[in-house]
Regions:
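Glycine-rich phosphate/pyrophosphate-binding loops
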Residues: 136-137, 289-290, 297-307, 383-407
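Active-site/ligand-binding-proximal alpha/beta "capping" segment
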Residues: 334-398
Length: 660
């Protein structure tokens, strides 16, 4: 690593390297660094001709910086009088910081919260298996670091990745693309923490939150990939008789409140008030809360269902009220096969490419609901789209008040009556739910703190950060405080916010009228034709995929014993290129199949669940062959799954006994 005085040429070379590895992120950091330099130059120019008190605040820096020289002759950045590195020997200091960390056993990521001029980053990147991610809180620090040392090759190769506040979620995803599956070491920088402890601790909190959320997302993807596909295809015959959710958008016209009812433990405390004031609002219940409300004599207007698990159907069993379901196409297919008029409801759009079977313009013709990760966030988003006057929340505890994981009387609790045994008590089941994820604490509505977890805090953040077009109020009597959403007393709110019951009744009648409109026969016919076309396309495609899988297996074996099969490898590679080209050209099919092989995709791109063995990582050609094999194995399984489910759906929708 070459060192010179602060050099514009080196700075621009580094900024160019940033833009090569990640253009959008590179441009953002480049602009911030150049802006900080321009502000400093302008401040210097103004200060020579005006008193300090007259210098505009936008041009003055809140910190002062200078470069000193260590006893070993290396530059040391001093910020506000605090040296960010050892004034004796910055290199030795950096080596000591890395002592004890595993570096050579496998691919790893070292995540630095501040690095000063980057000595510790330079030492890290001497290890070939380590990728460094440098999170920085101040553009001035980066400007000095990138002007003193040439990091351009490391930046272009992706061995070094830099992040600068303010950080967006997509910045983090971009920086960790391809490496988030590797073991990650969090490394705070002593000098930076000594200078601005709060700023650099915040970087650590941001990183922790990002990885927790990413873990939750990956866990969900890999757990439900096949279930989502099966449910979506199996639901298609029933969806033909349902209405797109867009038909409810704007139905309230800003004249009627909507109460969104979650199934938190505190819901039981609000049942009497919900019943008393039932005629003053439209009621959307999440499916887990339905039977709690129904058994209390409360019938909602809409029931939102998004869970793909078969257990989800239990929440709807035995319901005979007049509410209509709002259904995500990937929800459990058993739900739409239950008896009852609630099924004559509405379906939402979906990010699944299969949604194009229902509409070529799903967001416009079906209607998109904002996904916050839970059924409650979806229900609130629907209330917004319906143009509620105010959005009222109840049962959104997002925590475990009174050491409970769910509302008393919920279906999940009632099912324990059937499976409870001496060794499996309901208290133990409740404890398992509370301890499934690491414990977190959050401020309680009742004062003090409540036990929660990272997953629930993700939903809490959605409620708090989601842009609010109309006022939101939290009627919950327990649970965490939702910052920015005022708490309210049910009775007092109703007194202060008069609502004509006739208007509410009119909206309720309109919802039922839309739901009960006869379905077009051509909808079912269109779905049947689309499925038959897709079924035929999969036949030819699966043959190519199977050939690709066989060839990938052969190539993998031949590359492992390369000396014996050199001529055959070249021949097979040529055939493999042709198959790759043909498979990749079928973008529509690969998009559809790709959603059901997310585990495989993550193994290839992120190293999820190990991905490659140490031997495959060391041998680049063997690693490529293994990734090819994993991909074709995944595609072959996906073809079989889709063909099987589509065949069943065609048989059902074309059967004269099937009534849409």
């Amino acid at each position: 690593m070459m060192y010179s005085d602060v050099d514009e040429t080196i700075l621009r070379k580094n900024l160019k390297g940033l833009s090569v590895s990640n253009p959008s992120l590179g441009e953002k950091i480049s602009q911030a660094v150049l802006d900080s330099r321009a502000a400093e130059n302008a401040s210097d120019a103004v200060s020579t001709s005006a008193p300090a008190s007259n210098v505009p605040s936008t041009l003055t820096s809140s910190s002062s910086f200078e470069i000193k020289t260590s006893k070993t002759g290396l530059p040391v950045l001093v910020a506000d009088g605090i040296a960010l590195h050892s004034l004796m020997d910055p290199i030795t200091e950096s080596k000591r910081l890395l002592d004890g960390l595993k570096k050579e056993d496998e691919e790893r990521v070292f995540l630095f919260f501040g690095a000063g001029l980057g000595y510790v980053v330079q030492e890290t990147l001497k290890f070939k298996n380590v990728t460094a991610v440098w999170m920085e809180a101040d553009p001035e620090i980066l400007r000095y670091a990138l002007s003193l040392f040439d990091y351009s090759e490391l930046l272009e190769s992706g061995k070094l990745r830099i992040l600068l506040t303010p950080l967006l979620e997509q910045d983090l995803y971009a920086a960790f693309r391809g490496i988030s599956g590797f073991p990650i070491s969090f490394i705070p920088h002593r000098g930076s923490n000594h200078w601005k402890k709060d700023s650099y601790e915040e970087l650590r909190f941001i990183a922790e939150g990002f990885f927790h959320k990413k873990d939750v997302n990956i866990s969900t993807l890999t757990r439900f990939e096949r279930i989502w596909t099966r449910n979506f295809i199996s639901n298609l015959p029933e969806l033909a008789d349902m209405k797109p959710i867009v038909s409810l958008f704007g139905v309230c016209r800003g004249k009627t409140d909507i109460l969104v009812c979650g199934a938190g433990p505190s819901l039981i405390l609000s049942l009497d008030e919900i019943r008393i004031f039932r005629n003053n609002y439209i009621l959307i219940a999440v499916d887990t809360a339905l039977m709690v409300l129904w058994n209390a004599g409360i019938d909602p207007d809409l029931v939102f269902s998004v869970d793909p698990q078969a257990l989800n159907t239990k929440y709807l069993e035995g319901y005979t009220g007049s509410a209509r379901i709002v259904f995500d196409p990937t929800s459990s297919y058993h739900s739409l096969r239950l008896p009852g008029t609630f099924k004559n409801g509405f379906f939402t759009s979906s990010p699944f490419p299969l949604i194009r079977i229902l509409s070529s313009k799903p967001e416009e013709e079906i209607g998109a609901i904002d996904f916050g990760g839970s059924v409650s966030t979806n229900a609130v988003s629907l209330a917004e789209k319906m143009e509620a006057r105010n959005i009222l929340l109840v049962g959104q505890d997002l925590s475990f008040p009174d050491k409970l994981a769910h509302c008393k009387g919920a279906v999940l609790e009632e099912r324990l009556n059937h499976i409870e045994s001496r060794k499996f008590r309901r208290e133990y089941h409740n404890h398992k739910q509370m301890t499934a994820l690491p414990v977190k604490r959050a401020r309680s509505i009742r004062g003090g703190e409540l036990r929660t977890n990272e997953k629930l805090l993700i939903f809490k953040k959605w409620f708090e950060d989601h842009p609010k077009k109309n006022p939101w109020f939290n009627f919950g009597k327990d649970g965490v405080v939702l910052e920015g959403i005022p708490g309210a007393n049910f009775a007092e709110y109703i007194q202060k916010n008069e609502c004509d019951p006739k208007t509410v009744r009119s909206v309720r009648d309109r919802i039922l009228q839309i739901a009960d409109e006869p379905a077009h026969a051509r909808t079912a016919h269109k779905i049947e034709n689309e499925l038959k076309t897709l079924f035929e396309q999969l036949k030819g495609f699966s043959e190519k995929v199977t050939r690709g899988r066989i060839l990938s297996e052969r190539l993998y074996s031949q590359i492992r014993a390369e000396d014996k099969f050199k001529d055959q490898i070249l021949k097979n590679l040529k055939e493999m290129d042709g198959i790759d080209e043909e498979v990749s050209s079928r973008k529509g099919l690969t998009e559809i199949l790709g959603m059901s092989i997310q585990r495989t995709v993550l193994m290839i791109t992120e190293g999820y669940e190990g991905g490659l063995t140490l031997e495959e990582k060391k041998n680049e050609r063997l690693g490529i062959a293994k990734k090819s094999l994993l991909l074709y194995q995944g595609l072959e399984e996906a073809c079989k799954l889709h063909s099987k489910q589509i065949g069943k759906a065609i048989a059902r929708i074309s059967d004269p006994k099937f009534e849409t």
